[in-house]
Amino acid sequence: FYRFIPNEYGKLHKGGQLQAMMVKGKPQFDSRNWNNKAMVLHQELEVEWVNLDNPESPKDDLRLRGYKQGAALFARGEGIHWGDKELYFCCTNGGKKQLGQVMKYQPSEFEGTDKEAQQPGKISLFVESTSKTLYNFGDNLTVSPNGHLIVCEDQYTDVVDNHLRGVT
């Protein structure tokens, strides 16, 4: 998961710093839960950010370089939506059964500033599917007017049976 800190707010053309998320005190944290349950539902983990050089990545190795520097692993990150002071994103094939996860990020009050370490942002596992009937390969997502998360499935199977799933 990445963020960009501009050199000058509102003027992206003036450059800045691309950063990757790292779980505080747990470098190279594996949120996928494929082999072991490192990420527990609703457990908030404080984050730090790793600076990434050469973000154009002509060798297509940005994620690998970030991981070597301690960035967390997420399973096929896709859809993203800003809710009410929180951000949600899909990890399409995350989870023990590899049916999908939704992560929730709560930014620091001091996000992107020198004071951020005093009150870091927090990442948590919001949803992890244990059954295809619950949730299967979430891709895009949004937050409805009543605050519930709506996730669009995106399976690649012989019989395509995708749904919109509501998460409360």
Regions found by a protein language model. Give the residues of each.
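Sequence/structural signature of beta-propeller domains
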Residues: 1-168
